[in-house]
Amino acid sequence: MKPTRLSYALRWLVFITVWSWVIAQPGAPVVTLGSPQVVQTRNPKAGVHTRLTDEAAPWKVQRTLQLVREMGAPWIVEFFPWAYIQYNPQTFDWSHADEVIDHARAQGLTVIARLGLVPWWARPDERVQPTTFNYLDRDHYADFGDFVHAFVEHYKGRVQHIIIWNEPNLSFEWGLRRVDAAAYVDLLKVAYQRAKEANPNIVVLAGALAPTLEPIDSERGLDDLIYLQQMYAAGAQDYFDALAAHAYGLTRPMADPPDPARVNFRRVELLRQIMIDHGDAAKQVYITEAGWNDSPRWNQAVKPAQRIEYTLAAFDWAQQHDWVTMLAMWAFRYPRAARNYQDGWTWVTEDFQPRPIYLEIQQQLRMTNDK
């Protein structure tokens, strides 16, 4: 049966109706950097570890960083994966990294860039050798060095601090291999030299060691105190400007004294002593991950009120120690809720609702009530 004029009219009416509905929907917000902002704070060492790596929407990137500024924290640590930026060997995609860094700077924030995560072309064939995205063999150290050089050169004048790798004293972060401090130092040397070629004034942070008590024969990792000693023994001293450290309190209060036999926030003081013992007292420590979890679903968490108390004390502690440049708490916000105990680390929900810890820390950090 041939279409009638009525059927044509109905089809046209449906098309117009649907199209009108589509164009009436609100589009993505137009995001501009806006006028430069200044962080108002009582504590110039306060920071947070943001997780914008997988945040696709520009307005969400901007809003996250606005909330950091409004809280009164002038520092952020952010991950810039090699695997994302140099997905193919010959090309670099700076678009998302530019977005994060430019918005952070517009909010008056100082960015510490954590570099790592190996692209597919620099990892073993997973069909032959199953591993993680953190596996990098010596044959590709130069490739990582080239990436570090490109990153530092691209962000000269915008990023002044980089962290080389993350928690290399854990097997998972070393590609499911037995950890190797000497191999990490070799990687650090390559990265340091290439970074300084691009910008002699860049601050290269080493370590970012996970606080752990794993013994020397463990397949899971190695005690961070032992690992740092091994780094010095392997000649690391000449290839980093400052130490990145992780300071998690678990169930212990901030004031719990440092002890080599347990993990607590002040364990970082033991790392500092190792630096002093090796003649590195002049170097600073940047605490790039830290904090307490307040999830009721995890046996290593604390109550929300305890988390607030310990965090307030930790920021005060940082101000009292001149060898600490900054203290970044994990983790400000996840792009998507984890729906498990990991959400107990966050300060702001995925839909930008401040949690109680945000509001309490904001009250401590802000110099005025103006936003």
Describe the residue ranges of each PLM region.
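Substrate-binding cleft and catalytic face of glycoside hydrolase catalytic domains
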Residues: M71-I216, L250, A281, Y334-A338
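Boundary/entry segment of secreted carbohydrate-active catalytic domains
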Residues: W21-P74, F79
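Structural recognition of alpha->loop->beta junctions
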Residues: G72, H149, Y155-Q160, Y227-A242, ...
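Hydrophobic faces of well-ordered beta-strands that scaffold small-molecule active sites
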Residues: P44-T50, I76-E78, V111-L115, I162-I164, ...
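Acidic/histidine-rich helix-loop elements
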Residues: A46-K60, Q129, F133-R138, E219-G221
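Short, acidic/polar
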Residues: E55-E70, D143-F151, G221-A233, I308-D316
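Noncatalytic carbohydrate-binding groove/subsite architecture in carbohydrate-active enzymes
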Residues: Y141, G145, V179-I308, A338-Y341, ...
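Aromatic-rich peripheral "rim/lid" segments of glycoside hydrolase catalytic domains that contact
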Residues: S7, R11-T41, A46, S95, ...
